[in-house]
Amino acid sequence: MERRRARSTLRQMSSIELYWLPLGAGGHSVRLNGLVFEAVVARVERRTACDLYHSALVVHAPSGRFVIEQAPVRDNQGAKRGVVAEGPVGSRLAGRFRIFRYEVRRWRNGVIPDIAEAVASPQLLSDDPSQAQRLLDLVPEVPTAVWGLDELDAGEMWNSNSLTSWLLERTGVDTDTLQPPLGGRAPGWDAGLVVARRVSVAAGARGRVIRPEHPLGVV
């Protein structure tokens, strides 16, 4: 009985939540650039332009509450934001300068600056304590590919959505049904899934037990 209560308490303390934020929320220049980008892509693909979304995660685990997000490097105080990795923006050469680098945050008691503008959020993806902790453990392992390029041959550019989908797929969360709010698009999402599944295939080749692969969902 006590063991059952303990498991129940752990589940109440644990969750993985997904937030969808309009691209450039709170930043007018980023939003304008996003609108221009989507207008061009939509024209090339001969479709209606969609709203673009950036994703972030909030993870509750027995070890605490954490914000998982990719964001521009603000200063040299990354440790205060739980930064576990950095990557280049645009090109590896440009990444020598802070303004052209992004940071990967695993921020204890952190904040998502634009959370008030989140749409159809939060989405509860899991209340499994082991999944929550596994996701936290995986954050330092996320690829730090060049933001905005398809450096990993995944079929689309790597960005903040790639970070989110990579972590969810590697954690074992069912990503098949995940998609941005109605009428929206999350560029980079499929790239994270593709790269994460390569890891699973490689693990399977070494004889590890892995989840079966499934077809890519349209995001």
Predicted feature locations:
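Short helix-capping/linker segments at secondary-structure and domain boundaries
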Residues: 62-65, 169-177
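Non-catalytic ligand/cofactor/substrate-binding and regulatory segments of enzyme domains
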Residues: 3-154, 199-202, 206-219
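Charged/polar, solvent-exposed surface patches and flexible loops
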Residues: 133-141, 166, 187, 191, ...
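Accessory, usually C-terminal, subdomains that scaffold auxiliary metal cofactors
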Residues: 174-217
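Active-site nucleophilic cysteine motif
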Residues: 52, 149-171
